[in-house]
A protein has these predicted regions:
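Single-stranded nucleic acid-binding surfaces, predominantly the OB-fold ssDNA-binding core
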Residues: 1-99
């Protein structure tokens, strides 16, 4: 399964959740609501989940092996870093223009 598109849908500036992403596989399947989290001095992804009746969470969809999880995480985090940098550059240029 090949990752064919990653969209960073929303970036947050406060709190441990830094962004929400959607990932498309083979131009045929999209997984929404992958969360990008920063905690314990590192970034990682959290797959979409649903709250159970006992107040625990269960992933709706998730990688079933470590290799694919690492590939997915690297790709999503790189897309986040690129989007966050672009957003930062936009803010800086907007500030410069307002001066």
């Amino acid at each position: 399964m090949k990752i064919t598109d990653i969209k960073i849908r929303k970036i947050f500036t406060e709190g441990p959740m830094k962004a929400i992403a959607s990932v498309t596989f083979d131009h045929q399947l999209v997984v929404h609501d992958i969360k990008i989290i920063y905690a314990k001095e590192k970034y990682f992804i959290v797959m979409p989940s649903r709250k159970n009746e006992d107040d625990t969470y269960r992933d709706i969809v998730h990688p079933i092996n470590t290799s694919f999880r690492q590939t997915l995480e690297r790709a999503v985090l790189q897309a986040y870093y690129d989007a966050a940098e672009a957003q930062s550059e936009l803010r800086e240029s907007a500030t410069f223009i307002q001066m």
